[in-house]
Amino acid sequence: MKTPLLGMTLAELKEVARSLGMPAFTGGQIAKWIYGSHVRDIAEMTNISKANREKLAEQYCIGVMENIDAQHSVDGTIKYLFPVASGKFVETVFIPDKDRATLCVSCQVGCKMNCLFCQTGKQGFEGSLTAADILNQIYSLPEAERLTNIVFMGQGEPMDNLDNVLRATEVLTAEWGYAWSPKRITVSSVGVRNKLKRFLDESECHVAISLHSPIPEQRATLMPAQKGMGIEEVVELLRQYDFSHQRRLSFEYIVFDGLNDSMTHARAIVNLLKGLDCRINLIRFHQIPDAPLKTSDEKKMEVLRDYLTQHGIFTTIRASRGQDIFAACGLLSTKKIYERIK
């Protein structure tokens, strides 16, 4: 089994070169071919001698794994199915818009968080992705050249696979890598003790926190992770960081009918986030099997948006994309696909 070069840092690629008796600068050449030119085969690295390319190819490969399925929505959204190193599969969603194109990537197969409203959690946890698995979703995307933004909002909890998420974002933002600005990348989280702080310290990417209720007891019924790191503790941690400049903080809030769409909730949100430089994205609930929840109506969402905005929190209602292909928020799951392919 050959080792993928995709996902390796510049230091690691230099070490690969040294271990094979090549000059250290060859590692830099490899990095440019992979992250700059996006080659599919080591043989394409033409400024490396043929002998060294052959030596490299004996033990290593680029690590490209093409998608095995693509579903197209009427709104232009495309959901791809990618294989990962473990033999499982993840879904990745390409969301084109007028002046931007966003890719929603997965970081785990399934998820441990088991949020009441999310189909991925119903799948259970089947393993974390490697950095190569994460980056392959971008590297092998047919529309990769069109991308303007990446969001870690697909399957899995990024803080539960933090080493590989940080490695992937390092490759994406480093000068020797994709050289993207960190402000083109948003990483979401329910809030995981210790891991969230490490992410905030080691990354400059935007952060999105799953809020869904400002009332701790209610949030715990929606999100078991509340019992591990409560939303008050999450907000207290966030207050230690500066989000007034390049880095952006947002809160995701799925609006459920009769559950979290009242003015009581609106006032509690304002009180919870008072003085914090942030924005809120209100999200429509997309029905999943056996979830005793309904989406709030448009008018209530507009009232909630207007109240929060009037009280100093910039708030938007997120447009639902890809709902007809089960690519919208909370609908990603590969369990049935895996069982069918297996």
Predicted region positions:
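Short linear Ser/Thr-Pro motifs
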Residues: 73, 106-107, 188, 210
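Ferredoxin-type iron-sulfur electron-transfer modules in oxidoreductases and energy-metabolism complexes
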Residues: 132, 136-144
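Conserved AdoMet/S-adenosylmethionine-binding subsite of the radical SAM
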Residues: 142-149, 154-318
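Canonical Radical SAM [4Fe-4S] cluster-binding loop centered on the CxxxCxxC motif
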Residues: 96-133
